[in-house]
């Protein structure tokens, strides 16, 4: 299964959360992380006291788990528009960065691994809530 990690799931994995580690080991034949999630993580690292440590750990995790990074491109931007319009028609709002994360997930045809239940409102992707 292709698993796309949401920002909160990466954070929990980095802290050794058993449910995340188990889900990734069991379901994650192929692992992806959206560049948008990397942006959120870098923002948090820059605000914190252990920026270099956290950045190094992120690079190590990406390399060790052979994660592919999903970049935002024209195809992802189109999917973003589709998802945004679909949610707007339902009267549903989710955070803008999460729209981009959903679009990245849609781009690779993966299942989003997250703790955020609002992703279940996105009909275009499969979601696994932890």
Model-derived features: positions:
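Active-site neighborhoods of divalent-metal-dependent phosphate/nucleic-acid chemistry enzymes
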Residues: 68-113
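Acidic, PIN/NYN-like endoribonuclease modules and their adjacent C-terminal/linker elements
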Residues: 1, 102, 106-130
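Short, well-structured N-terminal submotif of metal-dependent ribonuclease cores
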Residues: 1-34, 45-60
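Acidic active-site catalytic centers that drive phospho-/nucleotidyl reactions
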Residues: 6-8, 40, 98, 116
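Short, hinge-like loop/turn segments at secondary-structure boundaries
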Residues: 47-52, 87-88, 129-130
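Conserved beta-strand segments of alpha/beta enzyme cores
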Residues: 30, 68, 126-128
